[in-house]
Design a protein with these regions (language model features):
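Bacterial N-terminal signal peptides that target proteins for export
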Residues: 1-8
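N-terminal signal peptide c-region/cleavage motif recognized by signal peptidases
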Residues: 16-17
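Short, conserved catalytic-motif segment at the N-terminal edge
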Residues: 23-84, 104-106, 120-127
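Active-site SXXK
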Residues: 31, 37-38, 57, 81-111, ...
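Short loop/turn motifs at secondary-structure junctions and domain boundaries
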Residues: 41-45, 74, 379-381, 388-391
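Short loop/turn microsegments at loop-to-beta-strand junctions
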Residues: 47-49, 60, 82, 376, ...
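Short, surface-exposed loop or secondary-structure junction motifs
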Residues: 116-374
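Structured C-terminal helix/loop/strand segments within mature extracytoplasmic catalytic/sensor domains
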Residues: 381-422
């Protein structure tokens, strides 16, 4: 199976439990890693986290370090819940492929078949002579479901030359759980706004997977959360994965910190919100504070909360070709399709040695990518850095994430460099 990588974040880096002996795993390197991560916490480079390392489906290391809530002196533990942001996209992409396997859709279908509002897409093209700084062009072809899965639909996160139009429509940022509006209604309104590029011409990271989540709801007649619970989370025994954390579990939700020039800062804060009006990554108050409940607007691109152990089960299912513990979620050929590169040579992709599958970044050339493993990816989304490294040949993977900047990037590099097979 080709290597897959997931965009997104989730503060999983190493936290409080067991390093287990496993053939082909260098325990001395794991010890170095544990000491390094403890030092990162002491130095104020990380507040805390959880690292889960698995090989051949067996847990090699599952340990917590640092703080779940530094100011309240609550230590991180392996059962801490983490906001996984864009790693939610992998769940939603799998849901779409489940629906294709069941005949509910084809990924070649135009989006307008299900949401007619997307039949008249306009694209904003920079034009200094235009009053708004851009002109509108009719999209050269319809957006397909495949375009959404590969982020080649031309839909971004409401930024660029038409950013003011998106802000005026109150569609901005990457998390909508606090909204009274359903995602299906929001997706219909998105169709009326200027898009960032013509379909099939560019890789544009954006609301694509949120739209796919709304499509899952439209076709299944369920909320995205209910569909994923029934079809994915429950069968895989992912008991600690939610869109809306039950009140009795909210004490397990880890605090989010941002790396600033003054060090780690608890999020959100009034000064950051004031100093960065309309900032894309800050001001996500409901998400960052964990005030999760009430409205039921399910963000298929960034809305889930999970644990390292739960997400490891999801990854293991994919590594095994769609099956885990005798439960088949996807067909083997479907997983192969998802992890193949679907970007044509005409679509520029800024990550050397990589392509993009149906929901995942795919490593194509280890040399060009310059990674130590069969696959590894560190992706930056402003202040969010996430690395998912999978040693496919050796069936080993680690998942790490942090809220930070280039300084934090060195931490995940260190992890990728130390955890490797003999």
């Amino acid at each position: 199976m080709k290597q897959l990588q997931l965009y997104g974040w989730l503060i999983w880096m190493l936290a409080g439990a067991n390093a287990l002996a496993a053939p082909g795993v260098d325990s001395a390197r794991l010890a170095v890693l544990e000491n390094s991560l403890d030092q990162y916490v002491q130095d104020g480079r990380l507040a805390g986290g959880v690292l889960y390392v698995s090989r051949h489906g067996e847990t090699v290391l599952h340990k917590a370090f640092g703080w779940q809530d530094r100011e309240r002196s609550i230590p991180m533990n392996t059962r801490s819940l983490h906001r996984i942001a864009s790693q939610t996209k992998a769940f939603t992409s799998v849901a779409i492929m489940l629906l294709q396997e069941r005949g509910a859709l084809l990924i070649s279908d135009p989006l307008s078949k299900y949401f007619p509002e997307w039949g008249d897409v306009k694209v904003a093209v920079a034009d200094s002579d235009a009053d708004l700084g851009y002109r509108l062009e009719v999209a050269t072809r319809p957006i397909t479901i495949r375009d959404l899965l590969t982020h080649s639909a031309g839909i971004n996160y409401g930024r660029g030359v038409a950013q003011a139009a998106w802000q005026e429509a109150d569609i901005f940022g990457w998390y909508f759980a606090g909204d009274q509006e359903s995602m299906r209604d929001k997706v219909r309104r998105m169709a009326t706004l200027p898009q960032a590029a013509h379909p099939g011409r560019e890789f544009v990271y954006g609301y694509n997977t949120d739209i796919l989540g709304a499509l899952v709801e439209h076709l299944s007649g369920q909320t995205l959360g209910a569909f994923l619970r029934q079809q994915l989370f429950a069968p895989l025994r992912m008991r600690d994965t939610y869109f809306f954390v039950p009140p009795e579990q909210q004490a397990r939700l880890s605090t989010v910190y941002a790396m600033t020039k003054d060090g780690l800062q608890r999020q959100p804060t009034a000064d950051i919100a004031t100093a960065n009006p309309g900032n894309f990554y800050f001001g996500q108050g409901h998400y960052l504070q964990g005030q999760i409940g009430g409205p039921r607007s399910y963000s298929g691109g960034a809305g889930a909360v999970s644990t390292a152990a739960d997400y490891a089960r999801f990854l293991e299912m994919l590594r095994r070709g769609g099956e885990l513990d005798g439960v088949r979620i996807l067909g083997r050929k479907t997983v192969e399709l998802m992890t193949a590169n679907h970007l044509s040579r005409d679509i520029a992709y800024s990550r050397p040695g990589s392509g993009f599958g149906l929901g995942f970044n795919v490593l194509l050339d280890v040399g060009q990518a310059g990674q130590l493993a069969d696959q590894a990816r560190v992706s930056f989304n402003g202040d969010l850095v996430m690395s998912l490294t999978r040693y496919t040949t050796e069936s080993t993977y680690i998942s790490t994430t942090a809220l930070g900047d280039q300084y934090t990037f060195t931490v995940v590099q260190d992890i990728s460099g130390v955890v490797s097979v003999k």
